[in-house]
């Protein structure tokens, strides 16, 4: 996204005839919130003082007796919304406490900013680069609901392998074979092209896009790496564009980790490296062309993997994806080129600038401010303490017999297991006051409340299994 000063934003509003300004920010759980004000209300003071709003209405934020909050727009994030009329300019905001004048501790964008600053304070590096590959589904119809006497969901897609008659029965993608046939089999190419064109117009550099393994419109758009905060901001915009383009065409996009029970889920493989003074610290002469720094970073991520999964895979649904047989990692191992490992070292290029690791277990239901910050903090801990990642695992982990799997640590099998791991292993996140104990406890309590909400609802499959016993 282009970078602006407050004065340049005000000039842009006048030049483009902007009528409304939309102020956006994330709640703790990764959902964009917004408030809209007429453009004539925007002045230089707006950037200095901010705009007041009710923080008690945001899930996980203030109580009603301390509800006043301030949203201060970041001019560097300004863009003209291509979907909204009349012409509307959007800015992402930082959240402040109006009483103390300080940043709000539950503003997850602040956590991301603190993580970037802490990296510099350690002297290890000055920039952490992230390149997420956020996968999604596009459906033609979606229905779901729960009530006192029912619980159900139903999705459909013209690409769905279960639709064998109409429409386009001659161009169906066979089950789990969506990677990646050309049109007319790939019916979503034009939609993705439109998404990419809008992303490019708004400053998000796209490297490629393609259909994914699952049928029913699963796709992936890969965006070029960027620094932690910039990339997290871009990921919110990425998801917004995907959803809005789908909606424009009467379709429905979702980033849920597991939608279809017998098909691949949607992940967010995250490429990651640390740089200093323009030099890639992950390039070296060790295994797969990595440096010792990179291996220690891997050691930290593997050691703290169960804990950071509470942020990178933050929903009950996330763990329906992390099962064998659907190209998602379940074991905390690392390897070159090996997509069955939790961490893969891509080998596409021998250029030292391209050397990175790919953390394969996250999904796009995560809040990227928290997910990226947690990955970075685990890596820093690994580097500072020279945590040995052990030997690489170059075998296909999915095909190993049980006796060979015993020595390989597992990712959590459920959100409850991930929260338990976070509860027992969060000291590394507190360094530099990046995460606070108060925020971590809020996260654990909120997520356990989600688990309880689901725990008391019988699953429709239970009726098939147990109705007439």
From Swiss-Prot:
L-glutamate binds at residues 264-265, 321, 327, 339, 360. Binds 2 Mg(2+) ions per subunit. Mg(2+) 2 binds at residues 135, 212, 220. The activity of this enzyme could be controlled by adenylation under conditions of abundant glutamine. Transmembrane segments: none annotated. Its EC number is 6.3.1.2. Mg(2+) 1 binds at residues 133, 269, 358. One of its GO terms (biological process) is nitrogen utilization. InterPro entries: Gln_synt_N (IPR008147), Gln_synt_N_sf (IPR036651), Gln_synth/guanido_kin_cat_dom (IPR014746), Gln_synth_cat_dom (IPR008146), Gln_synth_I (IPR004809). GO terms for cellular component: cytoplasm; membrane. One of its GO terms (molecular function) is metal ion binding. It is found in: Cytoplasm. Catalyzes the ATP-dependent biosynthesis of glutamine from glutamate and ammonia. Oligomer of 12 subunits arranged in the form of two hexagons. NCBIfam families: GlnA. This is Glutamine synthetase. It comes from Aquifex aeolicus (strain VF5). The lineage of its organism: Bacteria, Pseudomonadati, Aquificota, Aquificia, Aquificales.
């Amino acid at each position: 996204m282009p970078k602006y000063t407050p004065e340049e934003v005000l000039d842009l509003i006048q030049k483009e005839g902007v009528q409304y300004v939309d102020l956006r920010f994330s709640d703790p759980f990764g959902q964009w919130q917004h408030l809209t004000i007429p453009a004539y209300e925007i002045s230089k003071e707006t950037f200095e003082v901010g705009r007041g709003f009710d923080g008690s209405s945001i899930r996980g934020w203030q109580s009603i007796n301390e509800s006043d909050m301030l949203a201060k727009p970041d001019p560097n994030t300004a863009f003209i919304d291509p979907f909204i009329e009349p012409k509307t300019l959007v800015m992402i905001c930082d959240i402040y406490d109006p009483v103390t004048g300080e940043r709000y501790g539950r503003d997850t964008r602040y956590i991301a900013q603190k993580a970037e600053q802490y990296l510099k304070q350690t002297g290890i590096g000055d920039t952490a680069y992230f390149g997420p590959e956020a996968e999604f589904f596009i459906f033609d119809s979606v229905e779901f609901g729960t009530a006192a006497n029912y619980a159900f969901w139903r999705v459909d897609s013209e690409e769905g392998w279960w639709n064998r008659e109409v429409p386009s029965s001659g161009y169906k993608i066979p089950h789990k074979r969506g990677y990646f046939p050309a049109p007319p089999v790939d019916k979503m190419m034009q939609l993705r092209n439109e998404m990419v064109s809008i992303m490019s117009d708004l400053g998000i550099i796209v490297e490629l896009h393609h259909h994914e393994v699952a049928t029913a419109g699963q796709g992936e758009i890969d965006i070029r790496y960027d620094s932690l905060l910039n990339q997290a901001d871009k990921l919110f915009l990425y998801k917004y564009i995907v959803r809005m383009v789908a909606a424009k065409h009467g379709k429905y996009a979702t980033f849920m980790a597991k939608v279809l029970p017998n098909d691949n889920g949607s992940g967010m493989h995250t490429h990651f490296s640390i740089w200093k003074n323009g030099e890639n610290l992950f390039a070296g002469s060790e295994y797969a062309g990595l440096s010792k720094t990179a291996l220690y970073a891997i050691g930290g991520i593997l050691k703290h993997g169960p804990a950071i999964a509470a942020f990178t895979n933050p929903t009950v649904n996330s763990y329906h994806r992390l099962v064998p047989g659907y190209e998602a990692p379940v074991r905390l191992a690392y390897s070159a080129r090996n997509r069955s490992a939790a961490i893969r070292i891509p080998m596409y290029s021998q250029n030292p600038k391209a050397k990175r690791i790919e953390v394969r277990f996250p999904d796009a239901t995560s809040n990227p401010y928290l997910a990226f910050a947690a990955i970075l903090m685990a890596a820093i801990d690994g580097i500072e303490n020279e945590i040995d990642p052990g030997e690489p695992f170059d075998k296909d982990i999915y095909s190993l017999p049980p006796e060979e799997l015993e020595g390989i640590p597992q990712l959590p099998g459920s959100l409850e297991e991930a929260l338990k791991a976070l509860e027992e292993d969060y000291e590394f996140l507190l360094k530099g006051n990046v995460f606070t104990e108060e925020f971590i406890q809020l996260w654990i309590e909120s997520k356990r409340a989600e688990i309880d909400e689901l725990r008391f609802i019988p699953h429709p499959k239970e009726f098939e299994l147990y109705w007439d016993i």
